[in-house]
Amino acid sequence: MWVPAVANLLLLSLGLLEAIQAQSHLVTRRDLFSQETPLDMAPASFDDQYVGCAAAMTAALPHLNLTEFQVNKVYADGWALASSQWRERSAWGPEWGLSTTRLPPPPAGFRDEHGVALLAYTANSPLHKEFNAAVRQAGRSRAHYLQHFSFKTLHFLLTEALQLLGRDQRMPRCRQVFRGVHGLRFRPAGPGTTVRLGGFASASLKNVAAQQFGEDTFFGIWTCLGVPIQGYSFFPGEEEVLIPPFETFQVINASRPAQGPARIYLKALGKRSSYNCEYIKEMQCKSRPCHLDNSASAQERLSTAWSLLLLLAFLAVGPFPGSPGLF
């Protein structure tokens, strides 16, 4: 019964691809100097979900954070800027920044340091770029993470913040988002390939806002683990959604013209992590037994029901509706 629907989806995808390829693009500095990189499962990414060790990580944060401040000036400066902004916003009360929307109260367990971490990540500072570059390489080995990754605190706080903010969604709430990337032209894998984004990926509910982040690669994404962080972003007008590095996607369609941006369309599949609670294992589990949940290290896929719902959504509105600013 799904054959006609799948056929329609394929035809629609092919039509979108032909429309994209038919367009001409001017050669710009972006096209000449952007780097190329494959889009794959990002095997070197550090993807810890901290399943079963969140409380232990929280207890370790004061010492760990101080240590990282001493060796990582970019992180220390970014955290100081975000802390100042958090204090100002807290003093303003429920209306933050330029937004006139009254924010809902934060979820249970959400602490000031979660808010500061989100502000630090979204600020217009060198921190975002250096942090994600480090995340993409920190998982090359456990030793590399333990000895050379000086963003352990920020990685944990961002991961836990997204888990807490997404907890009220009950079942995964999937949404269409857009992501523009500057300086990287991804080499898309073929349709049907499973991929990850390799780091914490900022996207927007608005395609025009996403283009401001860059147009070397432009993604259209159906995400089920990405969480809206508008109220906790330095720039709430961007309607930002933050996607964790362990979410997996299926490539639905892709184009990589000789000139102009690569365009890649992804649909959520589930999540996969190679690491879990690595810092706690190193600090606490050598001298005494630790009982940690290792379930996060296995591949988890969306349920069949949610996969079908995603397919229906694609068929209902098209993978990525053509609107001004997208094509």
From Swiss-Prot:
<dbReference type="InterPro" id="IPR050999">
    <property type="entry name" value="ADP-ribosyltransferase_ARG"/>
</dbReference>
<keyword id="KW-0520">NAD</keyword>
<keyword id="KW-0703">Sarcoplasmic reticulum</keyword>
<dbReference type="Pfam" id="PF01129">
    <property type="entry name" value="ART"/>
</dbReference>
<dbReference type="GO" id="GO:0098552">
    <property type="term" value="C:side of membrane"/>
</dbReference>
<feature type="lipid moiety-binding region" description="GPI-anchor amidated serine">
    <location>
        <position position="295"/>
    </location>
</feature>
<dbReference type="GO" id="GO:0033017">
    <property type="term" value="C:sarcoplasmic reticulum membrane"/>
</dbReference>
<protein>
    <recommendedName>
        <fullName>GPI-linked NAD(P)(+)--arginine ADP-ribosyltransferase 1</fullName>
        <ecNumber>2.4.2.31</ecNumber>
    </recommendedName>
</protein>
<keyword id="KW-0336">GPI-anchor</keyword>
<keyword id="KW-0808">Transferase</keyword>
<feature type="active site">
    <location>
        <position position="202"/>
    </location>
</feature>
<feature type="disulfide bond">
    <location>
        <begin position="174"/>
        <end position="224"/>
    </location>
</feature>
<feature type="disulfide bond">
    <location>
        <begin position="53"/>
        <end position="277"/>
    </location>
</feature>
<feature type="binding site">
    <location>
        <position position="121"/>
    </location>
    <ligand>
        <name>NAD(+)</name>
    </ligand>
</feature>
<keyword id="KW-0472">Membrane</keyword>
<dbReference type="GO" id="GO:0016779">
    <property type="term" value="F:nucleotidyltransferase activity"/>
</dbReference>
<feature type="binding site">
    <location>
        <position position="233"/>
    </location>
    <ligand>
        <name>NAD(+)</name>
    </ligand>
</feature>
<keyword id="KW-1015">Disulfide bond</keyword>
<feature type="signal peptide">
    <location>
        <begin position="1"/>
        <end position="22"/>
    </location>
</feature>
<feature type="domain" description="TR mART core">
    <location>
        <begin position="73"/>
        <end position="273"/>
    </location>
</feature>
<keyword id="KW-0328">Glycosyltransferase</keyword>
<comment type="similarity">
    <text>Belongs to the Arg-specific ADP-ribosyltransferase family.</text>
</comment>
<feature type="active site">
    <location>
        <position position="240"/>
    </location>
</feature>
<keyword id="KW-0449">Lipoprotein</keyword>
<feature type="binding site">
    <location>
        <position position="179"/>
    </location>
    <ligand>
        <name>NAD(+)</name>
    </ligand>
</feature>
<keyword id="KW-0521">NADP</keyword>
<feature type="propeptide" description="Removed in mature form">
    <location>
        <begin position="296"/>
        <end position="327"/>
    </location>
</feature>
<keyword id="KW-0548">Nucleotidyltransferase</keyword>
<dbReference type="GO" id="GO:0003950">
    <property type="term" value="F:NAD+ poly-ADP-ribosyltransferase activity"/>
</dbReference>
<dbReference type="InterPro" id="IPR000768">
    <property type="entry name" value="ART"/>
</dbReference>
<keyword id="KW-0732">Signal</keyword>
<comment type="function">
    <text>Has ADP-ribosyltransferase activity toward GLP1R.</text>
</comment>
<keyword id="KW-0325">Glycoprotein</keyword>
<feature type="glycosylation site" description="N-linked (GlcNAc...) asparagine">
    <location>
        <position position="65"/>
    </location>
</feature>
<feature type="active site">
    <location>
        <position position="179"/>
    </location>
</feature>
<dbReference type="GO" id="GO:0106274">
    <property type="term" value="F:NAD+-protein-arginine ADP-ribosyltransferase activity"/>
</dbReference>
<feature type="glycosylation site" description="N-linked (GlcNAc...) asparagine">
    <location>
        <position position="253"/>
    </location>
</feature>
